[in-house]
Amino acid sequence: MATLADIGLAAAINILSALIFLLLFAILRIQPFNDRVYFPKWYLKGVRSSPVNSGAFVSKIMNLDFRSYVRFLNWMPDALKMPEPELIDHAGLDSAVYLRIYLIGLKIFGPIALLSWSILVPVNWTSDGLQLAKLRNVTSSNIDKLSISNVERGSDRFWAHLVMAYAFTFWTCYVLMKEYEKIAAMRLSFLQSEKRRADQFTVLVRNVPPDSDESISENVQHFFLVNHPDHYLTHQVVYNANELAKLVEDKKKMQNWLDYYQLKYTRNKEQRPRVKMGFLGLWGKKVDAMDHYTAEIEKLSEQIMEERKRIKKDDKSVMQAAFVSFKTRWGAAVCAQTQQTKNPTEWLTEWAPEAREMYWPNLAMPYVSLTVRRFVMHIAFFFLTFFFIIPIAFVQSLASIEGIEKSAPFLSPIVKNKLMKSLIQGFLPGIVLKLFLIFLPTILMIMSKFEGFISISSLERRAAFRYYIFNLVNVFLGSVITGSAFEQLDSFLKQSANDIPRTVGVAIPIKATFFITYIMVDGWAGVAGEIFRLKPLVIFHLKNFFFVKTEKDREEAMDPGQIDFYATEPRIQLYFLLGLVYAPVTPVLLPFIIFFFGFAYLVFRHQIINVYNQKYESAGAFWPDVHGRIISALIISQILLLGLMSTKGKVQSTPFLLVLAILTFGFHRFCKGRYESAFVINPLQEAMIKDTLERAREPNLNLKGFLQNAYVHPVFKDEEDSDEEGLIEDSDDEDCVVVQTKRQRSRRTTVASSNASRGSSQSTPFNQLDLGKGKPET
């Protein structure tokens, strides 16, 4: 059981760690040779040039301006100066909405902390429930006198906690509603003012039914010319190019090694570099490194060419899917948001993700296999969550000196040392839990990829959902349950079964001390480590020394990174959960959470302005997930408070808390119906307005040229295939086209407008269909 002294030691360690990280960052960021590490965003935008290109040698390495060291903390006010509209233009709406999550934390928990400390803390402190609990062998510490555990069983003081639960809920719901309304308006405004992008006109069609007489490309073209004759423009079929992508990736790796050895040779021309041919280059025959990698690259180039030819000729490489582009956003919206045929399992349409956020390997997965894959991952996630309770129990065993002494008496001489005791209880559990969770986001992302999601945003949102569930079940509930068992081990073993719920009711708020230590490790030192950027700093200088030859190489060596939504958002949600659960129970935890939200907002705002470069823009599409999880945390806090109050002899409060949970769920349904459509549906009115304005501004826009290669697989956009682009044939000069099928069972033809004829198929740079004068290619 962590005491006030233990928490003080943990706070000292984490504050010192955070200050060291911040000091190192403040000094390193102003050194010229680190400029690309701490300001890569501005280099990518082309508004910042390298300071190491001019001046004396020493000034290229070290900042000799003494005044800059005096102003080394200027990054803090600078991070707050940029107004939100400018931030959206600079970094995108996703980044701005992400920052608002931290602001919501401050808006919610600031007033809640004020109320709880002014009302609940005096109520708890002036009670003497823990004195009575000690008679039942319940372990506690002085800090627990600030919690609900100190209120006597059956006391009327619990009505104060009930009233505060209502106040906290109403305030949280008010803040959430205002934010939902604000962000929905920001999203619609952003989409309306956004520049023209291919995904605004494009729909992904999946589960295209096979036809024995027509290819997939011909089938897609025929279907949309018939059913969307006035709006269909062009399409690109989806190819299984995963093997080709692997070859291209291998070639890039070989090229990197060749560049490295060429640079090494230019620095020492007296001896050509050699490499061993054995496993990992540890043993085997030595050969000339440059000759070896040159030969490997030539070999891979031939394999890539052969694989491309195979894909051209093999119909099995064509998946039952296509990207279909339309002449207007309105036409794309109608197609994406409607059912295409009476069979709901065929011709499935959805908005195409932004081209740069496509996860191309998953497009090659057969659509029918996705259900099986997702079921398998549900089972795998269940077992991952279930078995992770073992390390959680280990962490909680560290958090309890009493539990260690009872289960391992031989360690008593060590843990009885005051400094060691404070270190074990106040710092070690939080850092061990943090280490156990390091690889979890990566594992969950791999599971999401296996499920077959086709966009990075959908992958991240699924992984984030699972991470949130994992935190809820293991990090929160698992820590409370296992920790209570360890700390109250003697009570659990000696008392009757009827008394165990009462002991748990007292022990749950006592676990606040463990979560305080975890918040300091993860939310204080962890956030400070984020701005320090140790890993990108080391990697950049290694690349700069071994691989960089030109300014382009130096730019590629930069690693600006991005906001990993799947890893960061669930962590934030854990703080919302802890804050809402413990606000009416143990208010002492709230200042630690408020400091986290304020500090993280400052750090991540700086990173978004100067460092991060997002790979895609979803216009804040993830906000409904954020809102829903905060509501879930609110309902969980009410249910846990209900259980706690019932164990404390206040069963009559149960109806009031049940009503509160029902009201909270009703509020969620209201927000879902009122605001969520802005995040999942593109209003036809907005699409028509944008189309009309675009036609007025650019009456001669060649939209087909803009769209025809937008969704070609990246491996087909290699410079070596530039000659393939010449294979694209246009039929814009036709005034009328007869859409004629190749089916032997049907001789019907469909006359389409001349506008539709301009939408002739543009499958890929190497698979085109020329309609000519209405005669299909044979």
Curated annotation (Swiss-Prot):
- Say if the entry is tagged with keyword Transmembrane: yes
What Pfam families has UniProt attached to this entry? PHM7_cyt, RSN1_7TM, RSN1_TM
Entry GO MF terms = calcium-activated cation channel activity
Where are the annotated coiled coils located?
none
Ranges that cross the membrane: 7-27, 101-121, 158-178, 375-395, 427-447, 467-487, 512-532, 584-604, 626-646, 651-671
Q: Cellular component GO terms, alphabetically?
A: membrane
Annotated InterPro entries:
Csc1-like (IPR045122), CSC1/OSCA1-like_7TM (IPR003864), CSC1/OSCA1-like_cyt (IPR027815), Csc1/OSCA1-like_N (IPR032880)
**Protein localization:** Membrane
Q: Where is this region: Disordered?
A: 738-778
Low complexity bias: start-end ranges = 753-763
- Membrane topology reported for the UniProt record: Multi-pass membrane protein
Please provide the record's keywords in A-Z order. Answer: Calcium, Ion channel, Ion transport, Membrane, Transmembrane, Transmembrane helix, Transport
Q: State if Plastid is listed as a keyword.
A: no
PANTHER family in the record? (RAPE) HYPOTHETICAL PROTEIN, PROBABLE MEMBRANE PROTEIN DUF221-RELATED
Tell me its family: Belongs to the CSC1 (TC 1.A.17) family.
What does this gene product do? Acts as an osmosensitive calcium-permeable cation channel.
Which protein is depicted? Hyperosmolality-gated Ca2+ permeable channel 1.4
- What species is this protein from? Arabidopsis thaliana
Q: What is the lineage of its organism?
A: Eukaryota, Viridiplantae, Streptophyta, Embryophyta, Tracheophyta
Q: Write the gene name.
A: OSCA1.4
